[in-house]
Amino acid sequence: MGKIIGIDLGTTNSCVAVMDGDKARVIENAEGARTTPSIIAYTDNETLVGQPAKRQAITNPKNTLFAIKRLIGRRFESEEVQRDIKIMPFEITRADNGDAWVNVKGDKLAPPQISAEVLKKMKKTAEDFLGEAVTEAVITVPAYFNDAQRQATIDAGRIAGLDVKRIINEPTAAALAFGLGSTKENQVIAVYDLGGGTFDISIIEIDNFDGEQTFEVLATGGNTHLGGEDFDNRVIDYIIDEFKKEQGVDLRNDPMALQRVKEAAEKAKIELSSAQSTEVNLPYITADATGPKHLAINVTRAKLEALVEDLVASSIESLKTVLKDAGKSVNEINDIILVGGQTRMPLVQQKVAEFFGKEARKDVNPDEAVAIGAAVQGGVLKGDVKDVLLLDVTPLSLGIETMGGVMTVLIEKNTTIPTKKSQVFSTAEDNQSAVTIHVLQGERKQASANKSLGQFNLEGINPAPRGMPQIEVTFDIDANGVINVSAKDKNTGKEQQIRIQASSGLSDEEIEQMVRDAEANAEADKKFEELVQARNQADGIAHATRKQIEEAGDALNADDKAKIEAAIADLEKAAKGDDKAEIDAKTEALIKASEPLMQAAQAKAQQAGGEQPQAKKDDGVVDAEFEEVKDNK
């Protein structure tokens, strides 16, 4: 069996590494570089990848594709894709399934299909170095990638001829690269990963015990649409706006000129990491009736920092949230690891240092650490790397919709994966023969405010009073973060399950919106949850009281029966409203009105010659509402 290679499939650059003895080694590509631009160009005769594709981008802008990772697993209508459409020189189009694809020379190409070209280049680079075929890989993704994006990455690997043995989060991979072989007994590190198109922050605990190293992710967060490309776009906009002021020409309408500006902006941004100012000089950038136009603009580091300070600030806000989720203070962080090329920017380093009160480590290569960590994980899976245990987490809570439109969480966010969690639910109606399991992801109490991942029916439930059937719902998340959900009737043994498909994954805007909404609406969520609990309690008491009236029969006099039924009607009317105090008051009124019913029941029981046995409580059964959804076939 061959080696399992580690691939950092980046937005701007990609990198491949492999275990060489007891250490991971980054492999140089055919051009002699340790990283490869994640750029793909389609010409009349061939497909170019990496530096050759980048070199011809100016003359072939519409067919030269870059930053495809920003489209992978995304819907065409999403805010991020619509924003990218305005600035990308190539054509982003809507696929039949609603995903964002790319139109090249009249052909619609899926992002996994395009990304596969980069993976093929990484595969070939490794094969040339090893002198043997490579069929297995560990591929990294941003920690905040959702199910759709993870599955799309696995698909890209499959298209490239690779069996993806594991999807690993980029900050976790960087931690592996940093901590492998460390002799420190216990340390907590923060991995700040600002790459070409994505941002992640993870708090990771590294333990050494009895010769075994454990890497445990305590919490993770980020933004899958924030990275160096966004920094570049700020510089591009500035250059274009300045040129328009001077010359009255908008270069956004000229794809070839726009590509030249893009390359110059990226170069200027990089130069300003070591210089205080740089000159952007693009002769013959365009022409009009008066003749050729030349672009010459001086950009200072101070100007660059002013253009992007809000982007850096948003990343610092994520740091605060993730530290809180991890239950750690700034003082408890032993080391800060910076990953991703954009972390070379002095402003980024300064703001991170200010937040943590200490400088980040300088001995970790931000371009190579992720690929090295992926190779280490490949070595772990292969058995070449011993005594290393990696414990990653799921970034968002998972659950199902239950009675009253509440999301009942089975797996909390930042739960270690792989994981499996089961909980028993029941029916909402008497003699209900089917239930629909509605799978949700998010942080809100109100089911409709979360993302629907899918739903499925469990049919053939034996007729029984409501609350009697026991439906066991199980969530199973594998080590790649891919979700399976099953439901089983414990009485009949009948089972149904669903694998959450890529087409129903979350977009990162929805993830971030869920978290923001959860924080902004925490009080509203609490009140809603209390209202639903009051409604559910009212419904249960009304249902039980009606049954007791039937059982009491003639033992209950007509006046008392009328009063109780009126109290039930009042309670049911109140339960349809949004006034919790009113529901509570009507619940108490029904309990008081039902006192004669209890006396009648006791009298009837004594006449029957013994006490009525108490109903057995359904311990561990959650009162849940399932509705049967009929398929229109």
From Swiss-Prot:
Q: Where is the composition biased (Low complexity)?
A: 599-613
Q: What induces it?
A: By stress conditions e.g. heat shock.
CDD domains from the entry? ASKHA_NBD_HSP70_DnaK-like
List keywords of the entry alphabetically: ATP-binding, Chaperone, Nucleotide-binding, Phosphoprotein, Stress response
Tell me which residues bear Phosphothreonine.
T198
Q: Which domain of life is it from?
A: Bacteria
| PROSITE patterns, per database record | HSP70_1 (PS00297), HSP70_2 (PS00329), HSP70_3 (PS01036)
A GO MF label: ATP binding
Q: Which Pfam families match?
A: HSP70
Region span, Disordered:
599-633
State the NCBIfam families in the record.
Answer: PRK00290.1, prok_dnaK
Tell me the function of this protein.
Answer: Acts as a chaperone.
Query: Which family would the database say this protein is a member of?
Result: Belongs to the heat shock protein 70 family.
Q: Know the name of this protein?
A: Chaperone protein DnaK
What is the phylogenetic placement of the source species in the record?
Bacteria, Pseudomonadati, Pseudomonadota, Gammaproteobacteria, Pasteurellales
